[in-house]
Amino acid sequence: MNLPSIIRRSADAARVAAEQNAAWLQGHMSPFFFMAMEDELEALAALAREMGRLRNNRHLILTDQDKRLVIACVNGPGSLYDTLRRVGDREISYAMFSHSDESMPGIGDELEVQRLEFDRRHNHEIDLQRAVEIPAALLRKVRAELRCSFPDFDLTKLDRLLKILWLNNENYIRMSPPSRTAYLIWLFDKGNASGGLFLDLSLVEREGRSETRVLFAVGNPPQEEFLLQLLEVFNRLEIAIRRAYCQTISNGIHPYFLGAFYVSGRQGENIHPSGKLADLLKRELCTTQIISTSTQAYKDYVVEGLLSGEDASLVNAFIAFCHTSLAHAQPDRFGLEDFQTAFYDHPEMAQLLIRLFRLRFDPDQVGRELLYGQALAEAREAVEAYNTGHRWLDDIRRAVYRCCLLFVTHTLKTNFFVIEKQALAFRLDPAYLRQLGKEFIADIPETPPFRITFFFSRFGAGYHIGFSDIARGGWRTVIARSADDYITSASTIFREVYVLANTQHLKNKDIYEGGSKMALVLDASDLDQAGGEAENCRLYKLQYGIANAFLDIFITENGRARDRRIVDYYGDDEPIEIGPDENMHDGMIEAIASLSRKRGYILGVGIMSSKRFGINHKEYGVTSIGVVAFAEITMAEVAGIDLRRDPFSLK
């Protein structure tokens, strides 16, 4: 045996194979792929040398570092999804996926390359006052691309948005073609303008081929497994991702997800933006803001293809409403698990109620009155006939199903069929309370309210209750930092809001505005640090998402909900004023007021008190904070005493 000769022959064969593979890669991978991999030449060389090993291996690891992972694999249904599941809870800052347009020679399957980076910037690192040097030539090219591709874009925003992207990932901006940077800036701006949620599907041309591009922007996205959840949507809908570029950046206040997906059907067919599949994709992508991956509805029903994400979010809203409606009066009889098992263990009952809800509120429903009447009779019969032979459990579950039935029949309008939503809102006729049963309302004041609105979000739920048409009152958020705290707070939140709103109504007896109150429970039980950055981001997501949902249903035109995807059984304007209360930070006050004005609510910025302009009721004695402020001012002016530093006595 002449080993050196064998090695030389093997090396020659490997060199020839690598050159052939390199030529194949050059011809069958997107030009954008090579731009995205410009800083990974060793990984590209390794791919050319080793590509043939994919005949017998599922993956080739091309780069494996603390902050970067590059993998080559055989393209197959769910391959991206499987990789992200293996990555686990590592925070992804950048993800790039790209497929070949032809099967690999001698293998018979397409090539897929996945690049993941784990280098997220924290909010405090994005300092817009910091000087950065963005190449003038790059700035000119991006500006020209924006003028050409997005003529409506306000170019005065370019410097600020590009600087944010640069501070987050300078290397990506340097390597990206100006066209990609331009649409990234446009997408970032659209996300901001749309209240933190924007989705665009369009057919685009590339090298003479049309393909479907999905652009998705999410302000303050869910932090755990969000990209995995998005890929689960594509996988479940049998949509193939040909290539994708996704970033999670920080705007200095909270994270921001910016994603571009180039997709097709599993057989390579285009997905038309106005088609049924595209509509379903839009709904499911936006529902990722509402359905949590940790819930049983998601894990056992959505992932398994038994429920859509939309329907699962509705089931979770059913559970939250029934829990908050029944448990406050009888906490020993009704625990959270009783409501969960009523729906999760009996999906046939959940499906009946989902169908009834859809028949009542689907804006495109034909023959609504007849079909809804039939479905209502069927649902009522199923609820009353529910019997498993376990009397104690049957009584509990019938009470739960009756409550849910009242929820569906007494909701007057909802934003459920609005696609671009971050939370669910349900405006109810309070008459349902009289039908709940005396045992469930014995612990609340007898005076019936004028309106009840229920809100449900990925991270919490709560109510707004008003005792007159024109009403005002504060908005407080209870932060539950343990599972026990959340269950306890959620169990009593309805009674708390009801009593506070009724008390406010009595206080307002001498003015034209009736009393109201809004309170939410935030689930922060899985977060490590109380009051930390992650908790604040979640608090802002809950509040801003529910503010948007509030405006979805209460913005009207000629007395009807302006958004025609909302079936409105109430049909009148509802001027509701909100004041800040517990855990409503100054920045959120300004954000909600600005959002209300931009979206065209009847009260404009008047929706929220204690803004920077006008009379700030935190400073003028309307709240406990205001009382302290009054005391500070009085002591300083009358006695020359600094209430916070100087010793003093009261006589």
PLM region spans:
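Structured loops at beta-to-helix junctions and adjacent beta-edge loops in soluble globular domains
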Residues: 318, 429, 466-468, 525, ...
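Positively charged, amphipathic N-terminal segments that serve as targeting/anchoring signals
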Residues: 456-460, 464-469, 480-491, 631-647
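Glycine-/proline-rich flexible loop or hinge segments
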Residues: 473-483, 519-527
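Non-catalytic interaction/regulatory segments
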Residues: 1-239, 243-458, 477-490, 534-538, ...
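Extended, hydrophobic alpha-helical segments in both membrane/secreted and soluble proteins
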Residues: 230, 234, 249, 627, ...
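Duplex nucleic acid-engaging cores and interfaces of nucleic-acid transaction enzymes
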Residues: 409, 469-473
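Glycine/serine-rich phosphate-binding loop and adjoining beta1-alpha1 elements at the start
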Residues: 497-649
